[in-house]
Amino acid sequence: MSLTLFSFLSLVSILCIVTAAPVTNVNFTSIQVSSMQHIAAINKASFFSPTALPANATENGLTGSCKPIILIFAKGTGENGNVGDGSSPGPAWFSELRNAIGEDKIAVQGVQYEADVFGYLVGGDPEGSQNYLTITNQAVTQCPNSKIVIGGYSQGAQITHNAAQLYSPLVTSRIAAVVLFGDPYTDKPVGQVSPSSVLEICHDGDIICTGSGGPDPHLTYSKNATCAAKFVLDRI
């Protein structure tokens, strides 16, 4: 992302920039750990809310026919389904893309994993990381003409990093765009994917991706759905 694009997005009042120093190591502070426990509890509680939409928490687009765009997404800690409910920006992001290009043009596939706090502490759930890798490889093999978009929120961003580190050159070449929300590893590359194809959305004061602040800014990434969709549309 260039400063020019950052400036443009600011003009349309869409927050998409890192406004505080990123985490520079993978050792989490006690405040980060307690914040993630708080976030996980809120996300789990949202499942029982009368306003929750559990049906939106699961996407299995790879079970259908190939579509021009395949989006693979991993939920955050404490969330349900395979793309998340609660504070997940995933469903809002998918909706923006479907509205822009048509539901028949995009298949969304979630990554199933435990998404507990322990997974966050070990750098991203190992089984989830493997599932992410397997799903990406499947998408590339199953749909050779599709463009692949990958993303994740919170711990889902961690397992996106973990999977991408193991992508083959062929798989990496098929990645059209990456969008990560509240990424604990926001300063680290996404495998060998070109930085120009990666959008890191990290809110000021989000302790999970900046190392300072608190948990509340980590719960508001759904408001960045329009920005995330625009980034992808500019690259497909």
UniProtKB/Swiss-Prot annotation:
The record marks Q155 as: Transition state stabilizer. Residues 1-20 form the signal peptide. The keyword Hydrolase applies. It is an enzyme of class 3 (hydrolase). GO terms for molecular function: cutinase activity. One of its GO terms (biological process) is carbohydrate catabolic process. Its main location: secreted. PROSITE patterns: CUTINASE_1 (PS00155). One of its GO terms (cellular component) is extracellular region. InterPro entries: AB_hydrolase_fold, Cutinase/axe, CUTINASE_1, Cutinase_monf. It catalyses: cutin + H2O = cutin monomers. It holds the Pfam family Cutinase. The keyword Secreted applies. Its EC number is 3.1.1.74. Disulfide bonds join C66-C143, C202-C209. Keywords: Disulfide bond, Hydrolase, Secreted, Serine esterase, Signal, Virulence. It is found in: Secreted. The 2 disulfide bonds play a critical role in holding the catalytic residues in juxta-position; reduction of the disulfide bridges results in the complete inactivation of the enzyme. PANTHER family: CUTINASE, CUTINASE 2-RELATED. Catalyzes the hydrolysis of complex carboxylic polyesters found in the cell wall of plants. Degrades cutin, a macromolecule that forms the structure of the plant cuticle. Allows pathogenic fungi to penetrate through the cuticular barrier into the host plant during the initial stage of fungal infection. Belongs to the cutinase family. This is Cutinase. It comes from Blumeria hordei (Barley powdery mildew). The gene is CUT1.
